[in-house]
Structures are given as C-alpha cells and as structure tokens.
Amino acid sequence: MCSQSQFGNQGEGSGSPLRTAIRILDEGNHDFCYEGEMNIDTALDPDLRARLFPDNRMEGPANVLVFAHADAASGVRNILKMKGGGLEVGPILMGMGNRAHVVSPSITARGLLNMAAIAGTPVAQYG
C-alpha cells in the first residue's frame, strides 16, 4: 500500500484509506503477503524496509503497488512504464460485480493480447 506516510506516521492524507484497507485485509484469511502504507522506495527496497520496519510482513520487493488515489497510481505507472523496461498489463478495475479491463488508444498489439488473455482467464473466486 503506497502512501506519503510510513505505517501511520501521518494521520491524514492517503494513509487513512489505506489503513482502512489493511484493517479489512487483516480480518480475512489471505494466501498473499501485504503490508501497511509506506513510501514507494520502502515498498520496492527490502533492505530499506528492513531497516525502517524490522517487523514488517514482506520479504523481497513489492510486486504489486496499491494507491489510494488514481492520479498517484497513474503517475507512477507511467514512470515505471517508461523507465522500468517492464511489461505493463492493465489497468484492471475490480469491485463492480465483475472485472473491467481498460485500455488506452495507444495500447500496443501485445498489450491488447495480454489484456485479452487476462479477460479470458476464469476467476476462481471473486468478491
């Protein structure tokens, strides 16, 4: 969960909805690892995270970044897409009774193929 705050050190801003999300996750039984709100560098750098928060639940760098606001997510997505050299798949919107796959007019053929593959993948459990 990416935020301007580190594990609640700022009471306001984007950390508040992310703390709510963490509380909801903590109530469930999940087979994936997650951690409370933190700066992006802390999420991606396990050594930094271990120094700042030795009792954190994560091992290794985060492979999913969650943001409270779409403008922050979009900015980071574009930076990573341009500088990271990785493969972008998404965005995928969830929580509307089913998945929605959103593509931009500038999507590549490969990007559209990736989204089609995800759209055709059955969901074992949704909700």
Label each residue range with its predicted role.
Residues 1-11, 20, 24, 46, ...:
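C-terminal functional extensions of proteins
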